[in-house]
Amino acid sequence: MKKAEFGQLPMPVQDYLLYLEAIKGHSELSVIEYASDLRTFFRYLAKEKDLYPPDTPDDQIDLRQINMEFIKTVTLSDAYQFLIYCKNQRGNAEATRARRVIAIRRFFIYLTDNRHLLEENPMKVLDAPKTKKALPKYMTLEEARHLLSVVDGKHKERDYAILTLLLNCGMRLSELVSIDYNDIKSNDTLVITGKGNKER
């Protein structure tokens, strides 16, 4: 999903996405993930609640017609059915379903606590599926040395520097590609802006 497509979402969702970026300070990528998860949820509901026939292709569902009156009809059971649909029909992994739960739950918190558009939050007790925490994969010192020793090619100095940063700092790829010349301080240190706009 692209930010330019936000105008195709229900107006309450559009307002929520603005709130996430302007007030909560979420990154554009995080806001796009919330938008995508909520779009999937409301497309599912549009078919389940008979706004559209069940066989309607997702891209032909006009979500702009979904308003607060429709949202007030959404129940906890609807969310559970949506998660079953995500697992069985969409083949979503536990982590994806857990992320979708967070998006739905936080959207309804916003409607209830921030905007006071709902008297009760139907998603208050919506739990995320348990996800398995995999141990991080790592290289041995010998493997890391070997990797650095085989760097070759036209941009070998650049590639060597990139690999050295990744190996020694444990930064994410997104953090690496977002490094700007101004991030390098006068004392030869580098400030990385990571997930959640946290500097380290």
Task: Go through the PLM ranges and name each one.
Residues 1-200:
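Conserved catalytic core of the tyrosine transesterase superfamily
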